[in-house]
Regions:
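Primary recognition of RNase H-like, Mg2+-dependent phosphodiesterase/nuclease domains
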Residues: 1-121
Length: 121
């Protein structure tokens, strides 16, 4: 079994790993960690929600939260990383997006437009 490992961003970039979770009691949480190409910690945070519609919604909220976090830190070149392939798929369909996540994804796009460059992987 292959153990997942963290891959650093390019020199001059930051990487923000984020995740969302739903719990059996119906609550949810999001979190994000920002590191540079050396793995040096540049910030992180977690947010609790009194509700959780579903796991994909929490992943989308985590992405939104991560973009806000890096902007607060003054970052301009950021790679965002998630383990949620469904979110990556929805993000790449941006112009065709009509799901219940469309509003959140558009907000993320608007928030990220002030960054020099960012990507999702």
């Amino acid at each position: 079994m292959k153990v997942p490992s963290w891959n650093p961003p390019g020199d001059g970039w930051l990487k923000c790993n984020f995740d969302g979770a739903c719990y059996p009691d119906g609550k949810g949480a999001t979190g994000a960690v920002i590191r540079d190409h050396n793995g040096t910690f540049h910030g992180g945070s977690a947010k609790w929600y009194g509700y959780c519609m579903d796991a994909l919604m929490m992943e989308a909220l985590a992405f939104r939260y991560a973009v806000i976090l890096v902007k607060q830190r003054g970052a301009t070149r950021v790679v965002f990383e998630t383990d949620c392939q469904n979110l990556i798929h929805l993000w790449t369909m941006e112009d065709e997006q009509r799901s219940m996540f469309a509003t959140i994804l558009r907000e993320i796009h608007d928030l990220g437009s002030s960054l020099v460059s960012f990507s999702l992987c």
